[in-house]
Each structure stands twice: as structure tokens, then as C-alpha cells.
UniProtKB/Swiss-Prot annotation:
Chief location bin: cytoplasm
Annotated protein name in UniProt: Probable dual-specificity RNA methyltransferase RlmN
Species: Clostridium botulinum (strain Langeland / NCTC 10281 / Type F)
Record GO biological process: rRNA base methylation; tRNA methylation
Record family assignment: Belongs to the radical SAM superfamily. RlmN family.
């Protein structure tokens, strides 16, 4: 059986026609799934009995089961652990803002990139998620909170560009007016910096925001923090970023997790300013998430602000990320790992 969420409307139409069914039934089915959030074919009232049976025999609506749901004390952040049909568990985070609800979705079960500050990579990657499985996190979360989600961040467990085919199909699906109709400009994809895939993504001409996990302006330190830096130098990464900017005319966000005594000095800030000066970019400074498997400590707020001021003085737009959901282990990989290791 196949997950119907992996299908575009046109693909489902073609399948129905091949079974001597009416093509317009595809739109009716999509309406039940994506607008009414009905995930059982038998509850789709305007679908004929024969067609329901045909669909039930060949497809399932692959929305994951909620195995854990946590809400922060301020009620602005929800953390979900979702279980798929094969028993694999991933996590998603919903953040409520004045401008709408945003979800951080996972693209893989685990991750193989090995970034030292990330809990989701500690056990490696188990498998890729399909386009429909990524999409289903949004649908399951919408059903749970009873509100529409309008912004998507691909920044949960997994490296999106390590699952390129499924992630790009997800982007095509989620932005379609036949499914969730989320605008491309409301989507951010975060990558540790797989250079060839950044260029390939640029060639797709999406209007999404690309976020690069940078974390150091120096190759030696970046190699220590992020194994991907052993494959691609900062020079190569910046060339790929320039290609992306020139191709899409979209501003890139550079993410920089500040670790006390590691990458938070004024010297590092000045070096980063040199690397990024003149680029169409924005820097998001992040207090690092502390995990017991490494000795990384958060930089002080004073250091973070001083670091940011250096960047601003050099004409680089900079913000400090607001911490949300710390009381519910909302940072990437933390809750899933504590759950599956029980």
C-alpha cells in the first residue's frame, strides 16, 4: 500500500483513470484530506462506496500517531513526538506568533551530519522521510492545535539537502493550492552546507528562504564543530551562497550558534563580518542548546549582544533568536532522544 500524501493531485487523477474511475474524484479526496482533515476514506461522504474500497485497498493516509505532546508554560510552543507506520519516531515543534503559527519539521529519522551541538545526530540516520511524511507533520499538528499553520521551517531532525528528492517534492506539494497552499516565502530550509545541493536548489528557482548553519568563519573551528566542513571549505560554501543569491535574488540567513569561549569572541565577530560583508544576507545569532553529550555552554547574553553589535557596525543585519520552548526540550532532537532511549 502507498501513502496517498506522497501523490500530487495529477498523479492521483492518473491513477484513478487507470482504474477506470472518474478523475474528478481526486479533487474530492484531496478536499477531505487537506481541507477537512479527514484521514479515513470511509468517512468521505461524497465518495462512492466502490471508490472508497478501491482507495482503501491501495492507499493509506499516512498521518503519524501522536505519542507525546508537550506545551510550554507560556502556551506559545508545542512539541510533538510523531510515530510513523513502521514505528519510527520523529519530532516537530509548533511556535505561535502574532503573525501566525510556524512549524519546524523533520526531514529524516535521525541525521548523519554529526554536528557537535545537535542532539538529533547522536545516533546517526535511520532513514529518509518521504515527501508525504514531511507534509503529514503539518497536518497532524494542525489537527492537534485546531489552527492553521502558515509558516514552515525545515530545521528539525535531519539534513534536508541530504534528502533532496523527497524534500523538493515536499516543497512542490506543500505550496500547491490543491493541498496546504503555504506560500513559498513562508518556508525556510536550513542546511549545514552541502555545496552541490545548494546550487541544485538554486536552479529550482524556489522563493523560499535558505538558512545556512555556519557557526564559525574559520575552517579549522568549523571542522571541529561540523564534520561537513571537512568536505567543503568556507570559501566553497560562500561561492555556493553567492550562486544561490544571484540565481534567486533571495536573501540568505546565516545561523550562528554561540558557544562560550569557543566561537563568541570579538575576533570571531570581526572575521565573520569580513566573510559576509556585502552579501545579501541576515545573521541569526543563537544561544547554543546545551546537551549532556558535549561540553558546549551557552555564551552570555552580554557576549552575544557584543558579537551582534560588531556585525551591525559592518552593515550586516543581525538578530538574536528568541528562545522558545526551553522548558519542554523544544530544541532539535532533544525530546525524541530522551524518549527512544528509555
Amino acid at each position: 500500500m502507498e501513502n496517498i500524501l506522497d501523490f500530487t493531485l495529477e498523479e492521483l487523477k492518473e491513477w484513478l483513470i487507470s482504474k477506470e474511475e472518474k478523475a474528478f474524484r481526486a479533487k474530492q479526496v484531496f478536499d477531505w484530506i487537506y481541507n477537512k482533515l479527514i484521514f479515513d476514506f470511509n468517512n468521505m461522504k461524497n465518495i462512492p462506496y466502490k471508490t472508497k474500497n478501491l482507495l482503501s485497498d491501495n492507499f493509506y493516509v499516512g498521518v503519524p500517531k501522536v505519542v507525546k505532546k508537550l506545551m510550554s508554560q507560556d502556551k506559545n510552543t508545542y512539541k510533538f513526538l510523531f510515530e510513523y507506520k513502521d514505528g519510527n519516531i520523529i519530532e516537530s515543534v509548533v511556535m505561535k506568533y502574532k503573525h501566525g503559527n510556524s512549524i519546524c519539521v523533520s526531514t529524516q529519522v535521525g541525521c548523519r551530519m554529526g554536528c557537535k551541538f545537535c542532539a538529533s545526530t547522536l545516533d546517526g540516520v535511520i532513514r529518509n522521510l518521504t515527501s508525504g511524511e514531511i507534509l503529514s507533520q503539518i497536518m497532524a499538528a494542525q489537527k492537534e492545535i485546531g489552527e492553521r499553520i502558515s509558516n514552515v521551517v525545515l530545521m528539525g531532525s535531519g539534513e534536508p539537502l541530504d534528502n533532496f528528492q523527497n524534500v523538493t517534492k515536499f516543497l512542490d506539494l506543500v505550496t500547491s493550492d490543491t493541498t496546504l497552499n503555504i506560500g513559498q516565502r513562508h518556508i525556510t530550509l536550513s542546511t549545514c552546507g552541502i555545496v552541490p545541493k545548494i546550487k541544485e536548489l538554486a536552479d529550482k528557482n524556489y522563493n523560499i528562504t535558505l538558512a545556512i548553519s555556519l557557526h564559525s568563519p574559520e575552517d579549522l573551528l568549523r571542522k571541529e564543530m561540523m564534520p561537513i566542513a571537512n568536505k567543503y571549505s568556507i570559501k566553497e560554501l560562500m561561492e555556493a551562497c553567492d550562486y544561490y543569491i544571484n540565481k534567486t535574488n533571495r536573501r540568505i540567513t546565516f545561523e550562528y550558534a554561540l558557544v562560550k569561549g569557543k566561537n563568541d569572541s570579538i575576533k570571531e565577530a570581526k572575521k565573520l563580518s569580513t566573510v559576509l560583508k556585502g552579501k545579501l544576507c541576515h545573521v541569526n545569532l543563537i544561544p547554543v542548546n546545551e546537551i549532556k553529550e558535549n561540553s558546549y555552554e551557552k555564551s552570555t547574553l552580554k557576549n552575544i549582544e557584543s558579537f551582534g553589535n560588531i556585525l551591525k557596525e559592518n552593515g550586516i543585519e543581525t538578530t538574536i533568536r528568541r528562545e522558545m520552548g526551553a522548558d519542554i526540550n523544544a530544541a532539535c532532537g532533544q525530546l525524541r532522544r530522551s524518549y527512544v532511549s528509555k
